[in-house]
Amino acid sequence: MPIIKKQELSKRAGIAAGAESSILVGLDQGSQSLHIEEVSVAPNARIPRRINPHTEVAIIVQEGKLDAILGRERVAIGQGDTVLAPAGSAHGFLNRYEGPARLLFIFPTHQVEQVEVSIPGATLGFPSEKGLSGYQSPEDRPLGEGR
């Protein structure tokens, strides 16, 4: 039975600008199937919307506040809240708050397939209608705007 010391884990950048992750439990730590990853999201950073086609995922907010982008909806979540994303459902996260947020992603398998998605008519968490935000699309709008 391994004891995994958090301070001994290496952090990975690159999941998104302003986000880094560490695998807490996985194949390298001796897990038979479970995969748990801790992700830190800096202020004004986001985890792009994605789908796990064949695997559900539980995402637990350990620290901070952020917005969960679920399908076409944006919901504010904070410490202690859990998002359960069924297989095939679109989900992403946006930290438009002052401090960093820390999330645990819990998968029942090591083979986690993730596909980044764009949903027609859905935003990345910002109003996209010209006139409401002044921008044609969310990609045109700076992250720090509209708090």
Predicted feature residues:
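A short hydrophobic beta-strand segment most commonly corresponding to one strand
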Residues: 38-39, 58, 84, 98-114
